[in-house]
Design a protein with these regions (language model features):
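Core dinuclear metal-dependent hydrolase active-site scaffold
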Residues: 131-158
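Metal-dependent phosphodiesterase/nuclease catalytic metal-binding core
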Residues: 39, 155-170, 185, 190-199, ...
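Short, solvent-exposed loop/turn segments at secondary-structure boundaries
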Residues: 28-29, 53, 105, 176-181, ...
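Conserved beta-strand hairpin/beta-sheet module of binuclear metal-dependent hydrolase folds
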Residues: 5-64, 156-172
């Protein structure tokens, strides 16, 4: 288990912060792995996207990188992305993420088992952004989009300066569909994001390398090839009866793509 923060600059005034947490296992089906937050710094303020497990002083790490006031956003409110929220007071999420909030307050297994230092009760408040909002950081703007599928109100950000899309868990090499929505709805959300454009690379929360904008096409192709016969048990979440389907043989491969879903949701995958 990684015990300290690690950060690196992915572009001028743009940082990836790898939070303390479980490192991924090798091979085709690594575990949940580390969580990466992103810090986007403008002339007047900064955005922090996600807060990790909450088991270390993320605020101090952020303050070591910028002295600007920080707007804290959650791409979604799963505990590995919102665990450090209490360090920031007010946290912004998409309006569509309201329905995900209630079940996600700490402590929640298996997160409690993974990290025994999380707070039992939140002492922060959520504020809500609308899809299409543009956040002005001073000489740098960040657009807020919705890309539902992993959760009903998953937020992605497009940064005008770098033309990076920060995807949280909405676009990853292995996406878990947990919103209770049809696979076709996730596909439509991907198509909507692709049509919006304005980005050249995708930075997700559980992989340290960027995915090119064309990675969306790889996920769309995977969805179009979906068949129940190609699905298999997802070993990283056997206790939760998760299934998966994928292209590629190893997670580390550039073109690897996988989608996981609950076994009980097979009918949703066919709609």
């Amino acid at each position: 288990m990684q015990q300290t923060f690690k950060h690196w600059q992915i572009a001028p005034d743009t940082y990836a912060i790898q939070c303390p947490g479980y490192l991924p296992g090798p091979g085709r089906l690594p575990g949940w792995g580390y969580v990466i937050c992103y810090l986007i710094v403008g002339r007047e303020k900064a955005i922090l996207l996600d807060t990790g497990y909450g088991n270390a002083d993320l605020k101090a790490e952020v303050e070591s990188l910028t002295d600007k006031p920080v707007l804290c956003l959650n791409s979604h409110v799963h505990p590995d992305h919102s665990g450090g929220n209490q360090q920031f007071g007010t946290v912004y999420i998409l309006e569509g993420e309201r329905e995900t909030i209630a079940p996600m307050y700490f402590p929640q297994p298996p997160e409690r088992e993974r990290c025994d230092m999380v707070r039992a009760l939140p002492d922060y408040r959520f504020a809500f952004l609308q899809e299409g909002s543009v956040l002005d950081l001073g000489g740098r703007s960040v657009e807020v989009l919705r890309l539902e599928g992993h959760t009903p109100g998953s937020m992605v950000l497009i940064d005008s300066q770098t033309r990076f899309l920060f995807s949280g868990d909405a676009i990853l090499k292995r996406v878990l569909l947990m919103a209770g929505q049809p696979l076709s709805q996730y596909r439509a959300a991907l198509e909507r994001t692709k049509a919006h454009g304005g980005f050249v690379d995708i930075y997700g929360a559980h992989w340290y390398e960027p995915l090119g904008a064309d990675y969306i096409d790889k996920v769309l192709a995977l969805i179009d090839d979906f068949s129940p016969d190609r699905c298999e048990s997802a070993p990283w979440m056997e206790a939760n009866n998760m299934m998966m389907f994928c292209h590629g043989n190893a997670f580390e491969e550039k073109d690897f793509a996988a989608i996981g879903f609950g076994e009980k949701d097979m009918a949703l995958m066919l709609r």
